[in-house]
C-alpha cells in the first residue's frame, strides 16, 4: 500500500549534515521512499496519509550487533571482564537454547520487546543450536523485521556443554543455510564467534561457505586486550588480530563484514580495514560494562572507516538504540579528554548518521529518506518532555533532547513500508 506520513521530518544527508523538514510529507511507494515534500504532490492525491503533525519522524535505527540469546540476562552480571564473563555467565546461559521449549519462551520475549523499540534493522547473533536459531529467524520474519541472524560457530576453547566438533559445525551450518532459504526478510550471516573459539580448519571451511554462498560475515575484533594477546598465541602466523580474519578473506575483500567493538586497533590493521567493506559495530555500553575500553570512533570517522552503532545485548545493558546514540557521544568525549585530544568528539549529527545511514549502508539503500531508499521510519512522541522552548528548537535539537531525556518506546514504526507499530 502506498501512503504518506505527515510530520516533522529529520534525517542524515552525510556524516556531518542533516535535513530538517518541518510539517512536511514523506511519501512511500511500494515500500520505498519517494522523497520529502512541503506540500503533497498532486500525483499522490488520494493516498492514505498518516497524520503525525507535531511529531518527530526519523529513519528507523540500525543495531549492528546484538546477541538475542543473551537478552534473558540483560542488566545482570556486569562484575567481570570479557573472557571471565563469557565463561561464568554467557556460555551457561546460551547452552539453555539446546532446549527448544526454553528457546521459544526466551525468543518470544525478545522479539516482542524489540518490536516496540526504534530498531528496524539488525545483525544478530543466535547460538550454535540450529532449531533455536531457525525459530528466532521465523519469529522476526513474521513480525515484519528485516536483517541478519547468525548461527554461531565455535569448535575450541569452549565448555563441553557449548562446543561443536569442526565437522559438526560445518555440517550444521550448511543444514541451517538450507533451512532458511525461504525466508524473504531475515537473512543468514556467517558467524564465527571470534578467533579464540574457532580453529584454523573451521575458519577455512567457513570461508569456503562464505564464497560459495556469497554470504556476509559477522564476528568480534579486538574487544579486550587479554583477548588480543590470546589471539597472538593461537594464530602466530597472523601479524595482528585483523590479519587472523583477513587470512580467510573475512575482512571485507569478498563480502561485507561486521566486526564488533574494535576497541584496540593495530596500526597496520587499520590500514587493512580502511577502504574495505568492513563495518565497525561500535558498542559503547558493552565496552564500558565489561571494562574493555573506549573505541577510538573519532579516529575511525576521520580515517574513513565504516562505522555503525550497536547495543550488544547483553554485554550492553539496554535494547534502546537511543541510549547507544547517547553513549557514543559521551564516551567519545571521555576518550578525547583522556587520550585523543587530536581527534574530535562524536557530534549529535554524526551519532544520528551512525545509527541510520552509517550502519544502514550494510543492508543496501537503508537509513535515509532520499528517493529510492527502503522506507524505514519511526515516529517519536516528545510530549512526555515538558518544555516552554518547543517553538524555539530545531528538529535536530528536539532529537538531541529526546535521546538524553526520553527512552520511551516509539509512537509508530514502519519497516520497508509496512506499519509494525
Language-model segments: what does each one mean?
Residues 1-44:
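N-terminal metal-binding scaffold of metallo-dependent hydrolase/deaminase domains
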Residues 8, 26, 31, 54, ...:
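Divalent metal-coordination and catalytic microenvironments
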Residues 14, 374-421:
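C-terminal cap of metal-dependent C-N hydrolases
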Residues 74-103, 156-166, 224-254, 327-346:
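Active-site gating loops and adjacent loop-to-helix segments of metal-dependent hydrolytic enzymes
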Residues 74-145, 169-183:
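Alpha-helical scaffold segments that flank or form the walls of functional sites
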Residues 131-263:
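Metal-coordinating catalytic core of metallo-dependent amide/deamination hydrolases
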Residues 243, 247-256, 297-386:
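His/Asp/Glu-enriched, well-ordered alpha-helical/loop segment
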Amino acid at each position: 500500500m502506498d501512503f504518506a506520513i505527515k510530520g516533522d521530518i529529520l534525517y542524515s544527508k552525510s556524516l556531518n549534515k542533516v535535513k530538517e523538514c518541518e510539517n512536511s510529507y514523506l511519501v512511500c511507494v511500494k515500500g520505498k521512499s519517494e522523497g520529502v515534500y512541503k506540500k503533497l504532490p498532486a500525483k499522490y492525491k488520494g493516498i492514505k496519509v498518516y497524520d503525525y503533525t507535531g511529531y518527530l519522524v526519523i529513519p528507523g535505527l540500525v543495531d549492528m550487533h546484538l546477541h538475542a540469546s543473551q537478552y534473558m540476562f540483560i542488566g545482570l552480571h556486569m562484575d567481570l571482564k570479557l573472557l571471565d564473563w563469557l565463561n561464568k555467565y554467557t556460555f551457561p546461559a546460551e547452552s539453555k537454547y539446546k532446549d527448544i521449549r526454553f528457546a521459544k519462551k526466551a525468543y518470544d520475549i525478545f522479539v516482542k520487546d524489540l518490536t516496540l523499540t526504534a530498531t528496524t534493522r539488525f545483525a544478530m547473533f543466535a547460538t550454535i543450536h540450529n532449531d533455536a536459531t531457525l525459530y528466532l529467524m521465523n519469529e522476526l520474519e513474521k513480525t515484519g523485521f528485516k536483517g541478519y541472524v547468525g548461527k554461531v560457530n565455535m569448535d575450541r576453547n569452549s565448555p563441553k556443554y557449548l562446543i561443536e566438533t569442526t565437522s559438526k559445525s560445518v555440517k550444521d551450518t550448511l543444514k541451517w543455510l538450507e533451512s532458511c532459504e525461504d525466508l524473504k526478510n531475515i537473512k543468514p550471516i556467517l558467524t564465527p564467534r571470534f578467533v579464540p573459539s574457532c580453529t584454523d580448519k573451521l575458519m577455512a571451511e567457513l570461508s569456503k561457505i562464505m564464497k560459495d554462498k556469497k554470504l556476509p560475515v559477522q564476528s568480534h575484533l579486538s574487544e579486550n586486550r587479554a583477548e588480543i594477546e590470546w589471539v597472538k598465541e593461537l594464530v602466530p602466523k597472523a601479524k595482528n588480530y585483523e590479519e587472523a580474519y583477513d587470512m580467510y578473506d573475512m575482512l571485507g575483500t569478498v563480502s561485507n563484514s561486521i566486526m564488533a567493538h574494535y576497541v584496540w586497533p593495530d596500526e597496520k590493521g587499520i590500514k587493512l580495514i580502511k577502504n574495505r567493506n568492513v563495518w565497525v559495530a561500535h558498542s559503547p555500553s558493552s565496552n564500558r560494562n565489561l571494562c574493555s575500553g573506549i573505541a577510538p570512533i573519532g579516529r575511525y570517522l576521520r580515517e574513513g572507516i565504516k562505522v555503525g552503532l550497536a547495543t550488544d545485548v547483553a554485554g550492553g545493558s539496554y535494547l534502546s538504540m537511543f541510549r547507544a546514540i547517547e553513549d557514543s557521544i559521551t564516551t567519545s568525549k571521555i576518550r578525547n579528554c583522556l587520550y585523543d585530544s587530536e581527534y574530535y568528539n562524536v557530534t549529535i549529527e554524526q551519532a544520528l548518521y551512525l545509527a541510520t545511514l552509517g550502519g544502514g549502508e550494510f543492508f543496501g539503500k537503508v537509513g535515509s529518506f532520499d528517493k529510492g531508499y527502503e522506507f524505514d521510519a519511526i515516529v517519536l512522541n516528545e510530549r512526555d518532555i515538558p518544555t516552554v522552548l518547543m517553538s524555539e528548537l530545531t528538529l535536530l535539537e528536539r532529537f538531541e533532547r529526546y535521546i538524553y531525556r526520553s527512552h520511551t518506546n516509539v509512537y509508530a514504526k514502519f519497516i520497508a513500508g509496512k506499519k509494525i507499530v
